[in-house]
Amino acid sequence: MKDYDLDLIQVLWVEDDPMVIEQYPLKAENFGLQLVAFPCWDEAKAALENDFDRWSAIILDAKCKYHRDSEDNAVRFLGRALNDIALICEKRGRVIPWYVLTGGDAEEVSDSINDDRMKWDADWTNSTHKEYYSKNVDNEMLYKRIKVHARKSPRLQIQKMYKDVFDAIEECGIDDMGYNALEDLLIPIHFPDAIE
């Protein structure tokens, strides 16, 4: 049984600033997003691997930590986290869009971000000439963009098309394997191009 709000788009969020963790999720809910914060990449990676189908997007604070006790280093953190995300998504056969949200040094952050994100976020870079979102001015725009990108996800579209069925699965207490199996059956029927 899912232990989170199915009406909100689930966003895995790597952020270690307590003030940001307290404030940002409230605003994100207004956009239909639930930000689930993890203080370091180790913990976020475990959540991504253990509940992959839950997540519709990933937000990375560029100045976050790879390990709970490591020092902030955007180059090391982003390089390793983005590599891990690519490997996990490839293994699972589904791309989860990721975004970098930072209040840090633009040059250091930009140099650390690979071009994978251009598959879903190229129009942002083309219009702003940035590969990241600024905590100071872009967070609401990021939430809007995540919502738009997530709505295009075949998995979320199936959940909306068959909302009554998935609600019944929840009410009956059927475990996540049944829920995921039904999604896996319905996606190729409605979105054959989404299958690789």
Predicted regions, residues:
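Charged alpha-helical initiation segments
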Residues: 134-137, 148-195
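C-terminal output helix
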Residues: 43, 108, 123-150
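Acidic, metal-coordinating helix/loop segments flanking the phosphotransfer/catalytic sites
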Residues: 37-57, 65-66
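Conserved acidic segment of CheY-like receiver
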Residues: 2-19, 24-28
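Conserved phosphotransfer microenvironments
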Residues: 54-98, 103-111
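Short, aromatic/basic amphipathic alpha-helical patches
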Residues: 24-28, 110-118
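Hydrophobic/aromatic beta-strand patches that form the interior of the parallel beta-sheet core
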Residues: 12, 97-99, 122, 133
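Generic structural signal for residues in well-ordered beta-strands
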Residues: 35-36, 132
